Structures are given as structure tokens and as C-alpha cells.
Regions:
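Short hydrophobic/aromatic beta-strand or adjacent loop that forms the aromatic wall/cage
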Residues: 74, 170-176
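Conserved N-terminal entry element of GNAT/NAT acetyltransferase domains
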Residues: 2-30, 178
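Conserved GNAT acetyl-CoA-binding A-motif
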Residues: 133-144
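Conserved active-site alpha-helix within GNAT-family acetyltransferase domains
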Residues: 123, 145-162, 169-171
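Short aromatic/hydrophobic contact patches that present stacked aromatics
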Residues: 109-111, 139-141, 174
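Acetyl-CoA-dependent GNAT
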Residues: 19, 23-29, 34-117, 123-128, ...
Length: 178
């Protein structure tokens, strides 16, 4: 049992050493788009209308990625493991309505391949994102059915504000880290 724990700990440390967070560059656009499409489907299948699930194809995600990377209000970072995109974060320096928190940056998207969950990739992306937007105060909307994401955000210091909204994916909860 002790040997198993040590082995798991060593694997976790090795994972951290091979994963790096970098600003997105054109050479990574397609891989990021594929991760976005795949994680979107995994998360939303069976929870939202199928036509909305099907809308986020790699081609559509690539179009979004190009637009977000070119927007000076946005920051797009990717997590690379052995030169393979395994996750990404998108932040806005100025939050979109209905968020009324001019002091905060908006964490608009955070997706990590399921195989990389619980290895520190999400936390590293959020930390790097805060540094990239030069703002420690973050606000986000998380869909109500995604209790895993809610738990992750609580674990890294976010809490619910009590504000909610309803979008295509259903009810969403506002969370902040300050």
C-alpha cells in the first residue's frame, strides 16, 4: 500500500514536470479546437439539447479559437503535455454582461481532458491565467449540472455569489475567488 501511494505520488510529480502552460500560438490552434470540441461533448452529452452539443465541432471551435486569440481583451492559454494540448483556459480582461464586476477578469472557459483531471492542470491554468490578465480577482459562470466543476472551483478558492442566470445550457451559477 505504501509503495502504491509512493508510485502514485511520483507519477503525479512527473505529470507536473512535463505539463507546461503557454500562450496559444497558431501552431496549436487545431489541437486546442479538437480538445474544446471533445471536452464540450463529454461534458454536455445528455444534459443539453443534442443540436447544441453537435454545434461545437472542431471546425467551429477552430473559428472561435482564431477569433479569441486575436481579441486584445482575451487571453488564451493552453496546457501542453509532451507537446500535446491537454487543456486550455480563456479569460476576458473586462467581463461580459450580465457580470457587473468591473474589478474582476472573467474566466470564460476552462477545459481539461478527463485523462488529465486531478493532476494539477486546471489549477495551473487558472494560476497562469490570473497572472496573464494581471488580475487576481476572477469571476465565472458555471452550469448548474456540472457539480465536478463547481467542486473544483470551490477547492481552488471560488465561492458562489448567489447570482444565477439561464442560458442555452440551463441554469448557471456565478462564482468569484475574492
Amino acid at each position: 500500500m505504501i509503495h502504491e501511494r509512493a508510485s502514485l505520488r511520483q507519477r503525479h510529480i512527473m505529470q507536473d514536470m512535463t505539463t507546461r502552460i503557454v500562450p496559444i500560438e497558431p501552431q496549436w490552434f487545431m489541437q486546442k479546437a479538437e480538445v474544446q470540441s471533445r471536452t464540450w461533448r463529454e461534458l454536455n452529452q445528455g444534459h443539453i439539447p443534442q443540436d447544441i452539443v453537435d454545434a461545437i465541432t472542431p471546425a467551429f471551435a477552430l473559428k472561435l479559437t482564431r477569433g479569441h486569440a486575436a481579441d486584445p481583451n482575451q487571453v488564451v492559454l493552453i496546457a501542453l503535455a509532451d507537446d500535446r494540448v491537454v487543456g486550455f483556459i480563456e479569460l476576458l480582461r473586462t467581463p461580459r454582461p450580465p457580470i457587473n464586476r468591473p474589478e474582476a477578469a472573467e474566466l470564460a472557459s476552462l477545459y481539461v481532458l478527463e485523462s488529465e483531471h486531478r493532476h494539477g492542470v486546471g489549477r495551473a491554468l487558472v494560476e497562469a491565467g490570473r497572472q496573464a490578465v494581471c488580475n487576481d480577482r476572477l469571476v465565472l459562470w458555471v452550469v448548474g449540472f456540472n457539480t465536478n466543476a463547481q467542486g473544483f472551483y470551490r477547492h481552488i478558492g471560488f465561492h458562489e455569489t448567489g447570482l444565477t442566470q439561464t442560458e442555452d445550457m440551463g441554469p448557471e451559477i456565478e462564482m468569484i475567488n475574492y
